[in-house]
Amino acid sequence: MSQQQGKFIVIEGLEGAGKSSAIALVNDIIKQHIGQAPVCTREPGGTPLAEKMRDLVKIADETDPLCDEAECLLIYAARTQLIANVIKPALSVGQWVLGDRHNLSSLAYQGGGRGLMPLVKAVSDACLRGFKPDLTLYLDIDPTLGLSRAASRGELDRIEQQAIDFFERARRTYLQLAHEDDSIVVIDASQSMEQVHNDIGIQLQRHLSTLMSEQ
C-alpha cells in the first residue's frame, strides 16, 4: 500500500496579526485530529541555509542596502530550499506541515507592497512549479493596528519598518488573492484573541474533515 500524502497548512498575515498564537492553536488542533504534531516551518527560513538568507532579508545593512529585487530572490531561494529539504520530504511520508508564511507572503509583500508582481509570479512559477498549500488561514488586520501591536513587542525588523502604504498595498493584495482562491480563508484578526481563536477553530474543523478525506 502506498504512503498517504501529508497536508500542508499555512498561517498568513501582516505584522501584528497574531500569527504566533494562531500557529500554536492550529498545531494543537492538528495534533488532536491526526495523533501527532505537524512539522512546523517558518519563512523565510526553516533550514540552516534558509535561516542565513532570512537574516539578510530581515536585518538592515546601511552600508549595502538590500534592493527590492534582491530581497525577492533571496526569499525565493530560501523557500525553494525549505520545500526541497523539509516540506516535500515530510509530506511524502504522510506527515502534516504547518507553515508560518509561504508563497502568499511574497505575492502580497514583494508583489503588492513592492510593486514587483511580474517578477514575483515569474520566479514563483519557476521555483514552485504549481506547489501550494492545501489550506491557508489569512489573519486580516488593518496595518495601523497591526504595526502598533508589533511595535509593542519591541524593536521592529527591516520589513516591519516599511511605510504604512507598503502594508496597505500588501493587505489589498492578500484580500484580492483570497477572493480568487477557495483554499485561502480570511479570519478577522482585529477581534479579541478569544474570538479570533474561536473563528480559527471553526474554519479549521470545517476544512480538516475534507482534507483528511482526501488522504
From Swiss-Prot:
Family under the similarity heading: Belongs to the thymidylate kinase family.
InterPro entries, per the entry: P-loop_NTPase, Thymidylate_kin-like_dom, Thymidylate_kin_CS, Thymidylate_kinase
A Pfam family of this chain: Thymidylate_kin
Enzymatic reactions: dTMP + ATP = dTDP + ADP
BP term (GO), one: dUDP biosynthetic process
Keywords: ATP-binding, Kinase, Nucleotide biosynthesis, Nucleotide-binding, Transferase
Keyword field contains Magnesium: no
PANTHER family: THYMIDYLATE KINASE, UMP-CMP KINASE 2, MITOCHONDRIAL
Domain of life: Bacteria
Single GO MF annotation: dTMP kinase activity
GO annotations of cellular component type: cytosol
Segments forming a coiled coil: none
Reported function: Phosphorylation of dTMP to form dTDP in both de novo and salvage pathways of dTTP synthesis.
E.C. number(s) listed in UniProt: 2.7.4.9
Residues that bind ATP: 13-20
Entry protein name: Thymidylate kinase
Organism: Shewanella frigidimarina (strain NCIMB 400)
